[in-house]
Amino acid sequence: MSLGNARPLVSVYTEKNEPAKDKNICLPAVFKAPIRPDVVNEVHQLLRRNNRQAYAVSELAGHQTSAESWGTGRAVARIPRVRGGGTHRSGQGAFGNMCRGGRMFAPTKTFRRWHRKVNVNQRRYALVSAIAASGVPALVQSKGHVIDGVSEFPLVVSDEVQKVQKTKQAVIFLRRLKIWADIQKVYKSQRFRAGRGTMRDRRRIARRGPLVVYDKDEGLRKAFRNIPGIETINVDKLNLLKLAPGGHVGRFVIWTESAFARLNDLFGTWKKPSTLKKGYNLPQPKMANTDLSRLLKSEEIRKVLRDPRKRVFRSVRRLNPLTNVRQLIKLNPYAEVLKRRAALAAEKRTVAKVLAKAKKQNVELAKSHFANVATKAAANRAKLLAARKKKVAAKKPAAKK
């Protein structure tokens, strides 16, 4: 929860979803701690590995047969082969991981490094981040919890809930506080697991529901344990695996009044260290307000910032003037005149050849289409040149007498 959104007081709600009179609690400093999803995810992955049970294949697997290599000189692989004869099995490869009935490559051992050590301060940082994220409604809703009717976040209820001993009373309590919609989500999500887990007593899977954090168990655990999705935990034994299942922050947490009031003693504040954890100080956020858009648009920062640069840097296209005519004309404008002269000279030579050939063969030019076109082009060119000469002569000033 950012410092800008934190409230100084939190209301305590009764079993009937009514704010208790004169029972407002100061928001613990742990809810203002920085939220670090990266730390939570990393620590969760390490802690989850500590629950694994050691497994390995049998040391004798794949070696419970008599086999010996035939050696070299028989044009067959040197893999050990089963002894004997009179059966399909004799002569077949054995022992190797590429053989049928052989052992696996690098057989698994029970002395693998199953557990991972996590620094105490890192574990506490992840736990603090998960608690702080549970007080942000947007993060809780993004996790998939149905919290449309919940009155306030973080949700704190009176200690009378700890005395509930019947599941029927617990269901009534959840319905009154508008939490039952989240339990219905759990009911709808119940399904059979895909894979081998169905044969290993892990048949059904479902979504997670709310987490109830209490201080003293006076029947609360037995009352809530038969409701799907709901989990309970003591405030002194807060666990990251329950506060951030899957390594994702935003679990919906219901706090009892006494458990909520105990958070300052457990994690301390920024003015005094924790009284229950030796030498632990609550991590401070590097930014008091995490709304970057609001900060960058503020007048104080805008006065210091310089105006944006509006220069446009265009990349220069490197063109070869020997192959690109436009680039050649750009570098040497007279090249256009030379090219035009060369084209005219070539056309003139072509016309001369056609005329000479027609004269030699006594062919009339009117009947020859190419010669006719060439003569017309020559005539048009002569007209254009004459018109240009007239324009140039008209522009020249008349000579004085």
UniProtKB/Swiss-Prot annotation:
Lineage: Eukaryota, Metazoa, Ecdysozoa, Arthropoda, Hexapoda
Record Pfam families: Ribos_L4_asso_C, Ribosomal_L4
PROSITE patterns found in the cross-reference section: RIBOSOMAL_L1E
GO biological process terms, semicolon-separated: cytoplasmic translation
GO cellular component, one term: cytosolic ribosome
Keywords (A to Z) from UniProt: Ribonucleoprotein, Ribosomal protein
The protein's name: Large ribosomal subunit protein uL4
Species, as recorded: Drosophila melanogaster (Fruit fly)
Domain of life: Eukaryota
